[in-house]
Each structure stands twice: as structure tokens, then as C-alpha cells.
Amino acid sequence: ERMIVIPTMNTNHEKCDPLLKLIQDLDDTHIIATVHYYGEWVFSANLGITGFDEAIDDDGKTARTAADSAMETVYKTFTQNDIGVVIGEYGVLGYDQGEKCNQPGEELKYYEYVNELARKYGLCLMFWDNGSGIDRVSGKYEWKKPQVGEMLWASMEGRSSYAAELDTLYFGEEAEEDVLVALTLNGNTFTEIEGLTEGEEYSYDESTATVTLSKDYINKMYAESSREGRFGELVFTFSSGADWTEKLVRFKTPEFKEASGTT
């Protein structure tokens, strides 16, 4: 039989208690609750906080700890009281803007972790797509952001691994030393960097879960690039979960110069 879904006020996870009372008073096992979750506003819409683990306030709150609090609240209010929950929409508010808004790797960490919390607390997730996620025009039904699609599919089954820092390494000149990339494994093991030779172009320290990229390899790639922008993409693979792509970017510091005209 079909279930009736009732939302909290404004589908807000902070307004759970009134809905709990309503559902309990109705005493109907065919009623479930729903909330929507788009993460912390300043992270989700990139209002100055780009990192999933970047402090939002002086208390050390992050987008990750905010997700912890939100999902725990929903679980303790509804699930522990035998009321099913559907997260009827989740995502990030800046998704429509492509990579212009949310930092891609940090967005992936968000999806990975929200799925982990949903498994932990027995919640059902529904990814909100208003046309920005899946191509429905060509008939191919492919993800417009393939890495998002891969992460979402993988995260429904288990955890994925990623770099502890950003998914981008910036170089304003040739590297003077090897480059370290610390990994957050989440229970998996590192396998390889696709197309590279371990022991020559990179090495891996299992005890610290750190990949070391050879400066000779970096500088070779850097020298082959003739202009600012992305000059390499390194695909890290693991024993389970989605792959992780680390981008190599060549940049030049902007310079202020004289200009003329009207404003």
C-alpha cells in the first residue's frame, strides 16, 4: 500500500518536533516524514566557505559536522520513534552553476558523506535534479558531471576515498621538491594512479596514506604546457568506491596595470 509523506515546516530538519507530534497523534502506520537537505548555506552556495571541512564559525562548525547534526536530529526524532524518513531533496545549492560555484572535489566529499550518514541512520535519499544533473534532452540520460554521477552511484553501496585537501594542485613555476597528496581512505586501500609508474613517477606510503608525486614528473608535465590552465589530471583508484581525480593547474599571478575607460 502507498505511504503518505508529510514534510516538516519548510522541509527544515530543525522543525522536526511539531511533525513528530502530528504523526503520533494521527496514529497511522502509512505516514512517513520528509525533510530536504542542501547542507550549510555558506558552503552549499559558496558564500565564502569552499571546503567541506573548513570552519564556518568560531566554534569550529563545518559543513561536515552540520550534516552530522542534521541527520542525527532527523534520526532521533523520527526513525527512533518508528517513523520512516525520506530526504525528499538533497544536493548543493550551487549545482546549477557547474564548477563556477562549488569546488568540485569538496562537492564530491559532501555527497559521499551524506550517503554514509543515510546508511548509518537508515534514511532514504533522493538527489534533486532540476535538469542540471542528467542530460534528458539527447535521450542518452548521461550525467552532465560524470564524477558526480560516479560518486553518487558508488556512495549508495559504500564509502569512497579522496584527497584530504583540494582536488587541485597549483603551480606558478616548476616544482622545487616532490609533491605530497595525503589521502582520506575511509576504510579502503589505495591501488594506483592510472597510467603512471609507481616507484618512478610517484610513490605511496601506506603508513601515512600519502602519495608522493615526483617533481621530475610534475616538471615534465609543466614544461609541456604552454599556457596557464589545467595541464594534467591524475586518476587515483582504490579497492572500492569511486575514483578520485587530482588536477594539475598552471597559474600566473594577476598584475594590476594602468587602464583607461569609463565605469
Placement of each model-derived feature along the sequence:
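Aromatic-rich peripheral "rim/lid" segments of glycoside hydrolase catalytic domains that contact
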Residues: 97-194, 227-245, 254-258, 262
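Active-site region of glycoside hydrolase catalytic domains
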Residues: 1-50, 54-56, 73-92, 121
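Surface-exposed cleft-lining segments at the edges of enzyme active sites
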Residues: 47-64, 97-99
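Surface-exposed, short loops/turns at beta-strand junctions within beta-sandwich domains
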Residues: 215-231
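Short acidic, gly/pro-rich beta-turn/loop elements at beta-sheet edges
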Residues: 14-16, 43-45, 135, 193, ...
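Catalytic-core region of carbohydrate-active enzymes that cleave or remodel glycosidic bonds
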Residues: 63-124
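Extracellular/luminal ectodomains and secreted, surface-exposed scaffolds of diverse proteins
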Residues: 198-214
